[in-house]
Amino acid sequence: DGRIISQVNYSELPDDICTLDEALDACVPMWVNVEIKNDPEEPDFDISESIADETIACLVRRPEGDNRWLISSFRRETIDRCQELRSSIATAWLTVGVRPEEFNEVLSGLVKSGHSALHPWVNFVTQETIDACHQHGLAVNTWTCDDPSRMAELISWGIDGICTNVPDVALQVRDQASPS
């Protein structure tokens, strides 16, 4: 209806919009990547990073433990804040891509800031990207790959995770790529 969700009281939201807690309840016992949307171009942009504080507070209150979560965001400041608040919860930087001449410096910066993964756009990922991340101790989880042949290629290169709209296809590709 055009309202900005972050500016609406929960009691006024439609029933089909859930809280983070409710969404996480639905995901038990899965490992969950919580993506924080905090883009300066969005009407609900939060320069104070209180969204990071609220997300960490929600995850810490839950009984499952910190190793069940990974927090990702396109905004480095957001994941940096999450890392400052709770270093035991894994964090990852989402990116469309990084200039080749800056790539190693970016990876070193992610490691220095305590982040555990890079989440690059699927068209940015190469064997060299994955190898460089792994050499820095970072996992690589790409987004959004729905093409089975590209999934197979990424798996053969050692990708750690694939975000997809077709999880059934991804599981088939993974199972075919893995020796029995």
Predicted segments, located by residue:
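Active-site-adjacent structural elements that line small-molecule/cofactor binding pockets in enzymes
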Residues: I71, R81, I89-L94, E105
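Structural detector of well-ordered beta-strand residues that form the stable sheet scaffold
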Residues: N33, L70-S72, A92, N141
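An active-site metal/cofactor-coordinating segment within enzyme catalytic domains
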Residues: D1-W31, I36-D46, S50, A90-T95, ...
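Alpha-helical scaffolding within the catalytic cores
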Residues: I17-A23, R76, E101-E105, T126
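C-terminal active-site rim and adjoining tail of enzyme catalytic domains
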Residues: A92-S180
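Acidic (Asp/Glu)-rich catalytic clusters
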Residues: E22-V32, A57-G65, D80-R86, L107-G114, ...
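Conserved, mostly hydrophobic/aromatic
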Residues: L13, A23, V34, R75, ...
